[in-house]
Amino acid sequence: MYEKIFPNKRFKITMAFLQKHISKSESILDLGVENPFSKMMKTDGFEVRNTLGEDLDIDFSTLKNEKFEVVTAFEIFEHLLNPFTILNEIKADKILISVPLRLWFSEAYQSKTDPRDRHFHEFEDWQLDWLLEKTGWEIIDRIQFTNPVKKLGIRPLLRLFTPRYYLVYAVRK
C-alpha cells in the first residue's frame, strides 16, 4: 500500500503544520494503521497511537471509548463512506486532517491491486470545511499545496501549479 519512495514534500509540509499547532506533550490518535508518517511523528517526539485497521465506517469504538487530546487523519477521510459520523464521534478537542483535493483533470483514485485502497470521496476545500462546521469543529488554520510528480505529460504539468492537498487544523466548538 505504501510506496517505496515517500512523498517527501507532502511529509515535510504536514510535519511543519503539525509542529506549528500540536505540542509534543499532547496524546495523538492517528486514524489508520501505522504508516511511514506516523513513524516520523514518533521519531520527532510525538506521543502517537494508531488505529488497528478496523473499518472505521463500521467500528468506531476507539473514538467513542478512548480520550485523546488530538486526532490526526492524514489522507483517511476520502476512503470513508461516512466521515460525518467519525467527526461527530471524536472525543478529542483538536483535529488535524489532510485530504487530497478533487482535481478536475483526474478521475477518482482506485488501486488496481488493493480493493481497500480507493477514494469514496474526492473533496473540494469547501466540502471539508462544511463537514467540519456541521460536526461542531472550528477551523483555526488551513493550507493547500501542490505535489508535483517527476513525469512527462499534461497531468504532471498541471500538478505543478494545481493544489493537490488540503490540510486543516480545527478545534471543537
Question: Could you say what each language-model-derived stretch is?
Answer:
Residues 1-70, 84-93, 115-130, 141-173:
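Conserved N-terminal segment of class I S-adenosyl-L-methionine
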Residues 29, 74, 97:
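Active-site flanking residues adjacent to catalytic metal/cofactor-binding acidic residues
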Residues 33, 78, 101:
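Short, glycine/acidic-enriched loop or turn micro-motifs at the edges of active sites
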Residues 70-76:
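A short beta-strand submotif of the Rossmann-like class I SAM-dependent methyltransferase core
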Residues 76, 100, 145-147:
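Flexible loop residues that form catalytic
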Residues 81-85, 107:
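Short N-terminal helix/helix-N-cap motif within the alpha/beta-hydrolase-1
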Residues 97-121:
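Short, glycine-/aromatic-enriched active-site segment of Class I SAM-dependent methyltransferases
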Residues 131-137:
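A structural motif corresponding to the C-terminal end of an alpha-helix
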